[in-house]
UniProtKB/Swiss-Prot annotation:
Any Pfam family matching the protein: GKRP_SIS_N
Gene: murQ
Segments forming domain SIS: 54-217
Entry keyword Lyase: yes
Its biological purpose: Specifically catalyzes the cleavage of the D-lactyl ether substituent of MurNAc 6-phosphate, producing GlcNAc 6-phosphate and D-lactate.
PROSITE patterns: GCKR (PS01272), SIS (PS51464)
A biological process term (GO) from this entry: N-acetylmuramic acid catabolic process
Reactions accelerated catalytically: N-acetyl-D-muramate 6-phosphate + H2O = N-acetyl-D-glucosamine 6-phosphate + (R)-lactate
Name by which UniProt lists this protein: N-acetylmuramic acid 6-phosphate etherase
Subunit structure of this chain's protein: Homodimer.
Active site positions, chain numbering: E82 (proton donor), E113
Organism domain of life: Bacteria
PANTHER family reported for this sequence: GLUCOKINASE REGULATORY PROTEIN
Length: 295
């Protein structure tokens, strides 16, 4: 029942929120967000397990599929859509499925989070296989749509993870690796778009970033698979070449063009003083890891 969930309780520090000054409201919200950061830090072992599941899925050709309803689903979508431009992934590699479909991005879809059959249909629609990993996101930890999605994923042999903001979450029962961030009562009672949402976003950032590092999408701390789809990103790509190799801006531009806009290929070309084809071959042999390709 909802009344037993910590995220649904009244926060003792904000019982008189309507009587506070603007500055006092901002201060208490900032303090509560600090608590969310601490709560996430206590779940690093569990988050690490999820990252390992995701890396394993990617290595066998599988996908990462986030499933959620409301704010949780939208946060999953936010993380998913940032992966192609940041890491050069195919849009299908990291996906998000929202209860209620695309309409739920901008408005509430009545009854969507309770539709267990829709969760199964939605996963079938994207062709879920045992090679994939499904991560269910639900602040309450009990959203029927998410529970159903994880249950179905386990039935077909896919790896599963979960992210909840309450202890003893139902979704944890269907997860190979379960994260339970105890964020506690919200500034606005029950409004889990606040602390719980902040905590979920931090965890999603960790999962996608650490997983991409684990499959060679990063060299040093540079986004070497960045897709330069606009002028800002093209300049960033060239700056990465300058910083990673020590070449001049003019040389960076030349190598960038010779490497067909592929930053990691250009890095190997510069540091190994080789042509495009040899650099590509080195990267292929190194499974995409720049550091290994340079050895």
């Amino acid at each position: 029942m909802l009344e037993h969930l910590a995220t649904e309780q009244r926060n003792e520090k904000t019982k008189h929120l309507d009587g506070m000054t603007t500055r006092e409201i901002l201060h208490v919200m900032n303090e509560e967000d600090r608590a969310a950061v601490i709560a996430v830090s206590k779940q690093l072992d569990c988050i690490e397990k999820i990252v390992h599941l995701v890396i394993a899925a990617f290595r066998r050709g599988g996908r990462l599929i986030y499933v959620g309803a409301g704010t949780s689903g939208r946060l999953g979508l936010l993380d998913a859509v940032e992966c192609p431009p940041t890491f050069g992934t195919e849009p299908s590699m990291v996906q998000a499925i929202l209860a209620g479909g695309l309409k739920a991005i901008s408005e509430a879809v009545e009854g969507a989070e309770d539709d267990e059959e829709a969760a199964v249909r939605d996963l079938q629609a994207v062709g879920l296989t045992k090679n994939d990993v499904v991560i269910g996101i639900a602040a309450s930890g009990r959203t029927p749509y998410v529970v159903s999605a994880l249950r179905y994923a386990k039935q077909i042999g896919a790896a599963t993870g979960s992210i909840a903001c309450n202890k003893g979450a139902v979704i944890s029962q269907y997860a190979d690796a379960a994260v339970e961030i105890e964020t506690g009562p919200e500034v606005l009672a029950g409004s889990t778009r606040l602390k719980a949402g902040t905590a979920q976003k931090m965890v999603l950032n960790m999962i996608s970033t650490a997983s991409m590092v684990g499959i060679g999408k990063v060299y040093g701390n540079w986004m070497v698979d960045v897709q330069a789809t606009n002028e800002k990103l093209k300049e960033r790509a060239k700056r990465i070449l300058i910083e990673a190799t020590g070449v001049s801006a003019e040389e960076a531009s030349r190598y960038y063009e010779q490497a067909k806009g592929e930053v990691k290929t250009a890095i190997v070309m510069i540091l190994r003083q080789c042509g495009y084809e040899e650099a590509k071959e080195r990267l292929q042999q190194a499974e995409g890891f720049v550091r290994k390709a340079l050895e």
